[in-house]
Swiss-Prot record:
Name of the protein described by the UniProt record: GTP-binding protein 4
Gene giving rise to this polypeptide: Gtpbp4
PROSITE patterns the record matches: G_OBG
Alphabetized Gene3D superfamilies for the sequence: 1.20.120.1190, P-loop containing nucleotide triphosphate hydrolases
Keyword Disulfide bond: no
Cellular component GO terms, alphabetical: cytoplasm; nucleolus; nucleus; perinuclear region of cytoplasm
GO terms (BP aspect): maturation of LSU-rRNA from tricistronic rRNA transcript (SSU-rRNA, 5.8S rRNA, LSU-rRNA); negative regulation of cell migration; negative regulation of cell population proliferation; negative regulation of cell-cell adhesion; negative regulation of DNA replication; negative regulation of G2/M transition of mitotic cell cycle; negative regulation of protein ubiquitination; protein stabilization
Natural source organism: Rattus norvegicus
Phosphoserine modifications at: S122, S559
Localization per Swiss-Prot or TrEMBL: Nucleus, Nucleolus
Every OBG-type G domain range: 169-340
Lineage top rank: taxon: Eukaryota
């Protein structure tokens, strides 16, 4: 909505939910532990804080409700009357008044009990005062159950109301039920209003939007109105009356020519005269709908006189059919133009126009001489205007040709090219290509030269066949030399690429650190021309075998009792401690120990027994969360 967004009103909880939400928030967001041996001012402050916190929560929520709901005296009269019809203005104001009184009562209760708590001389008395304060607040809210439920229903209905801007350009449809109002709005706009062959299908206001002359227009579909006194009209009809009374719109009064709506033309004219005071200062158009069934010319003279009288009074009558879409666009155009003119006329009568006109200055140049200077209109424009007046047959488009020719049609856009030489339209090579003249790069005798070249090739082959054997052998040797030279060039290119790969800027591994495989070494030597057969006893093969232990383990010697203390003992093999194995020097050992301590910090902080301790403690103890919370069992709050 331009000014009113009723969809943003916060949800109004029920009285029970209201109490539960507030008390739960108090329990969660205030301290919960107090002991009787604490100083008395600390105990008082503990319970005062709970009372004030609860009071503030109630105050904020109730204030939010009061501020979100629209005040009937501050909003547009259209919405004020619409809410009065839908929700009863007195009931609505009474509910908001009750909420406001409840808010003040909660504030007064909190103030009184905080004053009494200042004189509490023990933990028990302060606690009882706190319980009494929270209990009285909850009782006050509990008594507002009906008001809260009513306001929640109003909120839900308000959020479903259509988005109507009372101040923008509007087309308003009205008339008897089932005369074709909803069908018209479905044709003109993208609204999807339900259309059924019975009366009062539309029970509330519906809105669609349409563009005309680069402006945004809203089309409002109203429920049907019956011809009886205002006091007897129901809520559905009063919505249409409210829209007619307050929206500055162009009114489209829809009349059913076929009388299939169940009401004759005289009854429809009677309704028109009944609600005519609502059409004052509004552009009005009479829409004669369902003309595909019966037209005005086919009516009786008495019925035709109805429309003639309306036209005599200055109301345009337009025949329409939503089935064949006849007259629909005409009605929209006529209504929009009349409303635009009416709005301009209204603004010109106001005081703001004079303020704007005083700021404008129209500069007119002085006349230089008596020579006439008529506007110049090219001859082509004049000729085109004449052709348009004659209404000569239109030029056939490619789409029309495609429909005529069917499968024989081929899209040819080159026939429309405007070239100096029309014979160049279908040239395969264009005259200009990317800024260059293509003819400059083409030899006209190229095909002739190609034929001569092919002839020369054939003659050379014939010449080779007619050569003596000695010359042919020399030619073959020359051919082999060329093949070898080609292989050498390719080898050089590979070497260059390998050299480029070696010349990278990344980290390099020294040659001595690289592990050389025996097979790779033998392949490389063979490629250089070295015979690598029967090399099992060569130095590189023996060294490779020595690198891994091939000797058998020494047999364990028989244990002999010690003959003397002084006998020689062999020194046991020394073993590196585990905490320093794999570490280079003392500096690295210190760094490893520091990292180990950091890794153990989190485990120690969580009180884990070790790395394998994955125990998860019970986050929801059963003795606190099991069982039902019935009335009188909520002491822990």
């Amino acid at each position: 909505m331009a000014h009113y967004n009723f969809k943003k009103i916060t949800v109004v909880p029920s009285a029970k939910d209201f109490i539960d939400l507030t008390l739960s928030k108090t329990q969660r967001k205030t301290p919960t532990v107090i002991h009787k041996h604490y100083q008395i001012h600390r105990i008082r402050h503990f319970y005062m804080r709970k009372v004030k916190f609860t009071q503030q929560n109630y105050h904020d929520r109730l204030s939010q409700i009061l501020s979100d709901f629209p005040k009937l005296d501050d909003i547009h009269p259209f919405y004020a009357d619409l809410m009065n019809i839908l929700y009863d203005k007195d009931h609505y104001k009474l509910a908001l008044g009750q909420i406001n009184i409840a808010k003040n009562l909660v504030d007064n209760v909190a103030k009184d009990y905080v004053r009494l708590m200042k004189y509490g001389d023990s933990l028990y008395r302060c606690k009882q005062l706190k319980r009494a304060a929270l209990g009285r607040m909850c009782t006050i809210i509990k008594r507002q159950r009906q008001s809260l439920e009513y306001l929640e229903q109003v909120r839900q209905h308000l959020s479903r109301l259509p988005t109507i801007d009372p101040n923008t350009r509007t087309l308003l449809l009205c008339g008897y039920p089932n005369v074709g109002k909803s069908s018209f709005i479905n044709k003109v706009t993208r609204a999807d209003v339900d259309v059924q062959p019975y009366a009062f299908t539309t029970k509330s206001l519906f809105v669609g939007h349409v563009d005309y002359k680069y402006l945004r227009w809203q089309v409002v579909d109203t429920p049907g109105i019956l011809d009886h006194p205002l006091e007897d009209r129901n809520t559905i009809e009063m919505q249409a009356i409210t829209a007619l009374a307050h929206l500055r719109a162009a009114v489209l009064y829809v009349m059913d020519l076929s009388e299939q709506c169940g009401h004759g033309l005289k009854e429809q004219l009677g309704l028109f005269q009944n609600i005519r005071p609502l059409f004052i200062n509004k552009p009005l158009i009479v829409v004669a709908s369902k003309c595909e069934v019966k037209r005005i010319a086919e009516l009786s003279e008495e019925d035709q006189k109805i429309f003639l009288d309306l036209q005599a009074e200055g109301f345009p009558v337009i025949e329409t059919s939503t089935l064949t879409e006849e007259g629909v666009i005409q009605v929209k155009t006529e209504a929009c133009d009349r409303l635009l003119a009416h709005r301009v006329e209204t603004k010109m009568k106001g005081n703001k126009v004079n303020e704007v006109l005083n700021r404008l200055h129209l500069a007119v140049p002085n006349k230089r001489d008596d020579k006439e200077r008529p506007p110049f209109i090219p001859e082509g424009v004049v000729a085109r205007r004449k052709r348009m007046e004659i209404a000569e047959p239109k030029k056939k488009r490619e789409r029309d040709l495609e429909l005529e020719m069917g499968d024989d049609y081929i899209l040819d856009l080159q026939k429309y090219w405007d070239l100096m030489n029309s014979s160049e339209k279908y040239d395969k090579i264009p005259e200009i290509w990317e800024g260059h003249n293509a003819a400059d790069y083409i030899d006209p005798a190229i095909m002739k030269k190609l034929e001569e070249l092919e002839k020369g090739k054939k003659s050379s082959e014939q010449l080779l066949g007619s050569m003596p054997v000695s010359l042919r052998v020399k030619t073959r040797k020359w051919w082999k030399i060329r093949q070898l030279a080609k292989q050498i060039r390719e080898k050089k290119k590979l070497k260059i690429l390998q050299s480029k790969e070696k010349n990278t800027q990344g980290p390099r591994m020294p040659r001595t650190a690289k592990k050389v495989q025996r097979a790779d070494l033998e392949n490389e030597m063979r490629s250089l021309g070295v015979d690598m057969d029967d090399k099992d006893n060569a130095h590189y093969a023996v060294r490779a075998r020595r690198s891994r232990s091939v000797t058998r383990k020494r047999k364990r010697e028989e244990s002999v009792p010690p003959s003397s203390i002084a006998r020689s003992r062999s020194r046991s093999c020394s073993k590196t401690p585990r905490d320093v194995s794999g570490l280079r020097d003392v500096k690295m050992v210190k760094k490893a120990k520091t990292m180990m301590k950091k890794a153990q910090k989190k485990m120690n902080r969580l009180g884990k027994k070790g790395e394998a301790d994955r125990h998860v403690f019970d986050m929801k103890p059963k003795h606190l969360l099991s069982g039902k919370r019935k009335a009188g069992k909520k002491e822990r709050r």
